[in-house]
Amino acid sequence: MLYLYNKHPRIKLRNAAIFDNINRVTVSFYKYIFIHEPIKFRNSLYRMFFKFNIFGRVYIANEGINAQISIPKKIYHKAINIITTSFAVLKDINVNLALDNRESFWVLRMKVRKKILFDNLPIDFFDPNNVGTYLSAKDVNNMLENKNSVLVDMRNHYEYKIGHFDSAINVPVNTFREQLFHIVDFLKHYKNRDIIMYCTGGIRCEKATAWIKYNGFKNVYQIKGGIIKYVRDARIENLLVKFRGKNFVFDERMSEVVSKDVLSKCDQCENLCDTYVNCFNSRCHNLFIQCNFCRKKFHNCCSEHCFKTLLK
């Protein structure tokens, strides 16, 4: 019998993944499309992913699907082809290849939610057919030469800290819901300029551009495929990569290196550093930037208090 969930402890699954010696490809995709029976769709997709030994995190809702997954490299093309041809809602999805293929996931988690991306707004404003105009890497570089363009980073502030475009502005909050709440007022002085939004892979900018268009902004654009596709395409096309630092990702890798520039500081000693870690104290698990010196000094913890808590 196939269980449509993980019945093994996380540590066991992680150890199994570490020692399986399977080369993997990390990809992401999303699609805003109406899914009539999300639970039924979820169970069918889970069976297929299980068959292909795919790990990752997938959210499904009536409004669509959002997936970050790790596929065995030797069956990557076969798996993507079968997945996209077996389900009508996945036809023509844009698959975003990660910028590096270090181990990203060791377990498959697939959940049905109210929304694939929570916006916490009181009105149903989102129309996937009325979003910002998509820009290629070349388009982005050209538009950034124009002083009328305003580049807006729609990621959380902790993501922005370790990597961003030089000219980008960012609402200093830690959730997308907060960003949407503040963004219209934040951009009110730029309403007559060209607004270019970007995020990690594009999903947040679909809603963000739709929201500001709903609120009267006219010249609204978004980077197609987000940072990931921009960097990959710019490298392939030998364009200047204008994103600097690291691209924060929500998996075991924590980040992808785009350039050698270090834009942030250690949260404990304030020396240059862009390495995110979680506090070793499981009751804290705080996400913070920590250099090697402080990692040793504080024993992988975010504070002396957390380290002393572990000793009790």
From Swiss-Prot:
InterPro entries reported in the protein's UniProt record: Rhodanese-like_dom (IPR001763), Rhodanese-like_dom_sf (IPR036873), Rhodanese_C (IPR022111), TrhO (IPR020936), TRHO_N (IPR040503)
Superkingdom of the source species: Bacteria
Catalytic activity: uridine(34) in tRNA + AH2 + O2 = 5-hydroxyuridine(34) in tRNA + A + H2O
Enzyme class, UniProt record, top EC level: oxidoreductase
Record keyword tRNA processing present: yes
Ranges where the Rhodanese domain occurs: 145-235
Family, per entry: Belongs to the TrhO family.
Protein's recorded name: tRNA uridine(34) hydroxylase
Gene, per the UniProt record: trhO
